[in-house]
């Protein structure tokens, strides 16, 4: 396993996920009867700061169709949590106008690169062009001095 499991943290994430699903109107329990389902959700709500109780509630009452979704959500959250710790793996975002993004995307596909690689390539090319222009202007100035 690439990422360390933090039991207390993950129990809190599971609690947040399940409460969010409940508030969106989804039945998070395995019970069809509304009153029984509501009782179990109230029980879960009262267990917010009890990681072991949350895990026990999930084992006993979670809807089977939510089990896989919950595991996937926690796995993704764990990855984002650990990747967010290091500057090198933390996701960054930039604002691009749609037309700019479209051009960059087409250019990336043409170059068979990712968007990040394409941006780095374009910056490197621009820097080398500026360095080349500086060398040419220095040579021109040197030639003018020689011809005087």
UniProtKB/Swiss-Prot annotation:
Pfam families attached to this UniProt entry: MatP, MatP_C
Listed GO biological process terms: cell division; regulation of DNA-templated transcription
GO annotation, cellular component aspect: cytoplasm
Alphabetically ordered keywords of this record: Cell cycle, Cell division, Cytoplasm, DNA-binding
Subcellular location: Cytoplasm
A GO molecular-function descriptor: sequence-specific DNA binding
Record-stated family: Belongs to the MatP family.
Subunit structure, as described in the record: Homodimer.
Described function: Required for spatial organization of the terminus region of the chromosome (Ter macrodomain) during the cell cycle. Prevents early segregation of duplicated Ter macrodomains during cell division. Binds specifically to matS, which is a 13 bp signature motif repeated within the Ter macrodomain.
Alphabetized HAMAP family for the sequence: MatP (MF_01073)
Protein known as: Macrodomain Ter protein
Organism: Pasteurella multocida (strain Pm70)
Classification of source organism: Bacteria, Pseudomonadati, Pseudomonadota, Gammaproteobacteria, Pasteurellales
């Amino acid at each position: 396993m690439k990422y360390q499991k933090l039991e207390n943290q993950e129990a809190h994430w599971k609690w947040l996920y399940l409460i969010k699903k409940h508030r969106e109107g989804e039945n998070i329990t395995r019970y069809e009867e509304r009153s029984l389902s509501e009782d179990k959700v109230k029980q879960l709500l009262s267990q917010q700061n009890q990681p072991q109780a949350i895990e026990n509630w999930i084992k006993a009452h979670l809807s089977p169709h939510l089990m896989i979704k919950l595991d996937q959500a926690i796995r993704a959250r764990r990855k984002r949590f650990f990747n967010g710790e290091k500057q090198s793996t933390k996701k960054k975002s930039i604002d691009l106008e749609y037309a700019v993004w479209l051009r960059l995307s087409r250019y990336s596909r043409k170059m068979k690169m990712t968007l990040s690689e394409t941006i780095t390539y374009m910056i490197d090319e621009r820097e080398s062009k500026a360095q080349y222009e500086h060398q040419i202007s220095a040579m021109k100035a040197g030639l003018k001095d020689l011809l005087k």
